[in-house]
Amino acid sequence: GSIDELIECAHRWPNAADVGPYIRQEDGSAYPSARAIPTLSNGIGHALLSGIWPNNPWSKAYRDNAVMDKERVAGWLSGSCLLVRWDAFCRIGGFDERYFMYMEDVDLGDRFGRAGFTNVLCPTAQITHAVGHSAGKHPESMLPAHHESAYRFQADRHPHWWQAPIRVMLWIGLKIRSVVVVGFTK
Protein backbone atom coordinates (compact mmCIF):
# COMPACT_ATOMS: atom_id res chain seq x y z
CA GLY A 1 0.00 0.00 0.00
CA SER A 2 0.87 3.66 0.16
CA ILE A 3 2.76 3.43 3.45
CA ASP A 4 5.00 0.72 1.99
CA GLU A 5 5.62 2.94 -1.06
CA LEU A 6 6.59 5.87 1.17
CA ILE A 7 9.02 3.66 3.12
CA GLU A 8 10.59 2.32 -0.10
CA CYS A 9 10.91 5.87 -1.42
CA ALA A 10 12.59 6.98 1.81
CA HIS A 11 15.14 4.19 1.34
CA ARG A 12 15.89 5.46 -2.18
CA TRP A 13 16.45 8.98 -0.82
CA PRO A 14 18.66 8.61 2.28
CA ASN A 15 18.92 12.39 2.71
CA ALA A 16 15.14 12.85 2.72
CA ALA A 17 13.75 14.28 5.95
CA ASP A 18 10.21 13.66 4.76
CA VAL A 19 8.46 11.82 1.97
CA GLY A 20 4.94 12.64 0.81
CA PRO A 21 2.42 10.93 -1.47
CA TYR A 22 0.53 11.99 -4.56
CA ILE A 23 -2.61 13.58 -3.12
CA ARG A 24 -5.85 13.20 -4.99
CA GLN A 25 -8.77 15.48 -4.18
CA GLU A 26 -12.28 14.08 -3.86
CA ASP A 27 -13.08 15.06 -7.45
CA GLY A 28 -10.11 12.99 -8.65
CA SER A 29 -7.86 15.92 -9.52
CA ALA A 30 -4.31 16.20 -8.23
CA TYR A 31 -3.70 18.43 -5.25
CA PRO A 32 -0.45 20.39 -5.70
CA SER A 33 1.14 18.86 -2.63
CA ALA A 34 4.82 19.32 -3.52
CA ARG A 35 5.69 22.95 -4.06
CA ALA A 36 8.47 25.49 -4.04
CA ILE A 37 9.16 27.50 -0.90
CA PRO A 38 7.16 30.73 -1.26
CA THR A 39 9.29 33.79 -1.80
CA LEU A 40 7.95 37.30 -1.33
CA SER A 41 7.54 37.75 -5.09
CA ASN A 42 5.84 34.46 -5.94
CA GLY A 43 3.79 34.59 -2.73
CA ILE A 44 2.47 38.07 -3.49
CA GLY A 45 1.90 37.29 -7.17
CA HIS A 46 0.08 34.07 -6.31
CA ALA A 47 -2.05 35.75 -3.60
CA LEU A 48 -3.08 38.64 -5.84
CA LEU A 49 -3.49 36.92 -9.19
CA SER A 50 -4.30 33.21 -8.79
CA GLY A 51 -8.04 33.83 -8.52
CA ILE A 52 -8.22 35.80 -11.78
CA TRP A 53 -5.19 34.43 -13.68
CA PRO A 54 -4.59 30.87 -12.42
CA ASN A 55 -1.54 30.17 -14.59
CA ASN A 56 0.33 33.41 -13.88
CA PRO A 57 4.13 33.08 -13.64
CA TRP A 58 4.20 33.64 -9.86
CA SER A 59 1.64 30.92 -9.14
CA LYS A 60 3.50 28.57 -11.49
CA ALA A 61 6.75 29.24 -9.63
CA TYR A 62 5.05 28.70 -6.27
CA ARG A 63 3.33 25.52 -7.41
CA ASP A 64 6.67 24.32 -8.79
CA ASN A 65 4.87 23.79 -12.13
CA ALA A 66 2.61 21.27 -10.35
CA VAL A 67 4.62 18.22 -11.46
CA MET A 68 2.93 15.64 -9.26
CA ASP A 69 3.52 12.43 -11.23
CA LYS A 70 7.32 12.28 -10.92
CA GLU A 71 9.39 11.28 -7.90
CA ARG A 72 11.33 14.42 -7.10
CA VAL A 73 12.66 16.84 -4.53
CA ALA A 74 10.34 19.69 -3.56
CA GLY A 75 10.67 22.77 -1.38
CA TRP A 76 7.91 21.50 0.90
CA LEU A 77 5.24 18.80 1.04
CA SER A 78 1.63 18.93 2.18
CA GLY A 79 1.31 18.11 5.86
CA SER A 80 -1.88 16.14 5.25
CA CYS A 81 0.24 12.98 4.89
CA LEU A 82 3.99 12.72 5.52
CA LEU A 83 6.49 10.04 6.41
CA VAL A 84 9.04 11.91 8.53
CA ARG A 85 12.52 10.88 9.66
CA TRP A 86 12.48 11.23 13.42
CA ASP A 87 16.14 12.26 13.75
CA ALA A 88 15.69 15.02 11.15
CA PHE A 89 12.47 16.17 12.84
CA CYS A 90 14.23 16.36 16.22
CA ARG A 91 17.28 18.10 14.75
CA ILE A 92 15.18 21.06 13.55
CA GLY A 93 13.04 21.17 16.68
CA GLY A 94 9.87 19.68 15.18
CA PHE A 95 6.88 21.78 14.24
CA ASP A 96 6.96 25.47 15.13
CA GLU A 97 4.13 25.81 17.64
CA ARG A 98 3.49 29.43 16.66
CA TYR A 99 1.61 28.17 13.59
CA PHE A 100 -1.97 27.53 14.63
CA MET A 101 -3.12 26.43 11.22
CA TYR A 102 -1.65 26.72 7.73
CA MET A 103 1.98 27.05 6.67
CA GLU A 104 3.27 24.70 9.38
CA ASP A 105 4.16 22.23 6.62
CA VAL A 106 5.80 24.96 4.52
CA ASP A 107 7.87 26.04 7.51
CA LEU A 108 8.81 22.43 8.28
CA GLY A 109 9.92 21.74 4.70
CA ASP A 110 11.89 24.98 4.54
CA ARG A 111 13.66 24.26 7.82
CA PHE A 112 14.45 20.71 6.64
CA GLY A 113 16.02 22.21 3.51
CA ARG A 114 18.00 24.78 5.50
CA ALA A 115 19.33 21.94 7.68
CA GLY A 116 20.62 20.13 4.58
CA PHE A 117 17.82 17.60 4.12
CA THR A 118 15.46 17.10 1.19
CA ASN A 119 11.67 16.79 0.92
CA VAL A 120 10.67 14.11 -1.60
CA LEU A 121 7.40 13.60 -3.47
CA CYS A 122 6.65 9.90 -3.95
CA PRO A 123 3.76 9.66 -6.47
CA THR A 124 3.55 5.86 -6.35
CA ALA A 125 2.07 6.35 -2.87
CA GLN A 126 -1.39 7.86 -3.28
CA ILE A 127 -4.04 9.14 -0.90
CA THR A 128 -7.32 11.02 -1.19
CA HIS A 129 -7.67 14.17 0.88
CA ALA A 130 -10.91 16.05 1.55
CA VAL A 131 -9.32 19.49 1.16
CA GLY A 132 -10.74 22.42 3.10
CA HIS A 133 -14.03 20.98 4.34
CA SER A 134 -14.09 22.89 7.60
CA ALA A 135 -11.95 25.78 6.41
CA GLY A 136 -14.15 26.43 3.38
CA LYS A 137 -17.22 26.86 5.57
CA HIS A 138 -15.65 29.63 7.66
CA PRO A 139 -13.56 31.93 5.44
CA GLU A 140 -14.03 34.81 7.89
CA SER A 141 -11.82 33.01 10.42
CA MET A 142 -9.77 30.69 8.22
CA LEU A 143 -8.45 33.24 5.72
CA PRO A 144 -7.12 35.58 8.44
CA ALA A 145 -5.50 32.53 10.11
CA HIS A 146 -3.85 31.64 6.79
CA HIS A 147 -2.65 35.20 6.36
CA GLU A 148 -1.27 35.32 9.91
CA SER A 149 0.73 32.18 9.17
CA ALA A 150 1.91 33.53 5.80
CA TYR A 151 3.04 36.71 7.53
CA ARG A 152 4.84 34.75 10.26
CA PHE A 153 6.62 32.63 7.66
CA GLN A 154 7.90 35.60 5.66
CA ALA A 155 8.63 37.74 8.73
CA ASP A 156 10.80 34.96 10.13
CA ARG A 157 12.75 34.93 6.88
CA HIS A 158 13.11 38.73 6.80
CA PRO A 159 14.03 39.45 10.45
CA HIS A 160 16.58 42.25 10.15
CA TRP A 161 15.86 45.83 11.20
CA TRP A 162 16.39 47.06 7.64
CA GLN A 163 13.69 44.62 6.45
CA ALA A 164 11.06 46.18 8.74
CA PRO A 165 9.41 48.06 5.83
CA ILE A 166 8.92 44.71 4.06
CA ARG A 167 7.26 43.25 7.14
CA VAL A 168 5.00 46.30 7.59
CA MET A 169 3.90 46.31 3.94
CA LEU A 170 3.31 42.56 4.01
CA TRP A 171 1.23 42.84 7.19
CA ILE A 172 -0.87 45.69 5.74
CA GLY A 173 -1.29 43.92 2.41
CA LEU A 174 -2.45 40.68 4.00
CA LYS A 175 -4.91 42.51 6.29
CA ILE A 176 -6.40 44.34 3.29
CA ARG A 177 -6.58 41.12 1.25
CA SER A 178 -8.39 39.37 4.13
CA VAL A 179 -11.01 42.10 4.39
CA VAL A 180 -11.57 42.19 0.62
CA VAL A 181 -11.71 38.41 0.07
CA VAL A 182 -13.90 37.72 3.11
CA GLY A 183 -16.17 40.59 2.02
CA PHE A 184 -16.63 38.98 -1.40
CA THR A 185 -17.49 35.59 0.10
CA LYS A 186 -20.37 36.95 2.20
Question: PLM ranges: what are they?
Answer:
Residues 21-23, 79, 104, 132:
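Histidine-centered beta-alpha loop that forms part of the nucleotide-sugar donor binding/catalytic region
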Residues 4-6, 66-126:
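A short, conserved alpha-helix in the catalytic core of glycosyltransferases
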Residues 34-40, 137-140:
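Short, hinge-like loop/turn segments at secondary-structure boundaries
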Residues 33, 43, 47, 91-92, ...:
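Residues that scaffold the ATP/ADP-binding catalytic core of kinase and kinase-like folds
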Residues 21, 38-75:
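Short, flexible, basic/aromatic active-site loop/helix in glycosyltransferases
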